[in-house]
């Protein structure tokens, strides 16, 4: 991709306060996109949506931090209504959010994990983007 190839494009990256989501958001910013940074981690600190938005801005894009719990349908609707109100469209959607179970249930036999773990993952990973 060329520099500023995404200038004028509007993106949302779910779960972008850290890790892969942060990397994707910054990469979109490097190409000039306006990127809605979503997550539950708002405020000061290295692993927050505010810090990711700052990184997107420094990369040449426009970072917009939005605190949203993707397990809450009303918060999801407010996010997309805000994007529509601000821009009238959404060009790029990256569904990256993931909920780490508390307590973590890594390893073992998947069929022995509580069904709530599955429901949470489907709710955040699939349903929230719908």
Please tell me what each predicted stretch does.
Residues 2, 12, 36, 64-66, ...:
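Conserved Rossmann-like nucleotide-binding pocket used by diverse enzymes
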Residues 4-37:
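Canonical Rossmann dinucleotide-binding motif of NAD(H)/NADP(H)-dependent dehydrogenases/reductases
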Residues 47, 67-80, 115:
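The beta1-alpha1 cofactor-binding region of Rossmann-like NAD(H)/NADP(H)-dependent oxidoreductases
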Residues 91, 111-130:
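Catalytic Tyr-X3-Lys loop
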Residues 10-13, 93-97:
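Conserved hydrophobic beta-strands of the Rossmann-like cofactor-binding core
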Residues 77, 99-119:
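Conserved mid-core segment of classical short-chain dehydrogenase/reductases
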Residues 31-51:
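Conserved glycine-rich Rossmann-like NAD(P)H-binding loop of the short-chain dehydrogenase/reductase
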């Amino acid at each position: 991709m060329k520099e500023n190839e995404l200038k004028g494009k509007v993106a949302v990256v779910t779960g972008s306060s850290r890790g892969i989501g942060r990397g994707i958001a910054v990469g979109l910013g490097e190409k000039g996109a306006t990127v809605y940074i979503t997550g539950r981690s708002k405020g000061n600190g290295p692993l927050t949506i505010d810090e990711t938005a700052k990184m997107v801005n420094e990369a040449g894009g426009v970072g917009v931090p939005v605190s949203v719990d993707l397990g809450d349908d009303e918060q999801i609707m407010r996010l997309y209504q805000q994007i529509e109100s601000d821009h009238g469209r959404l060009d790029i959607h990256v569904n990256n959010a993931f909920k780490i179970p508390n307590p973590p249930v890594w390893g073992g036999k998947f069929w022995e994990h509580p069904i709530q773990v599955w429901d949470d993952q489907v709710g955040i990973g699939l349903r929230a983007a719908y």
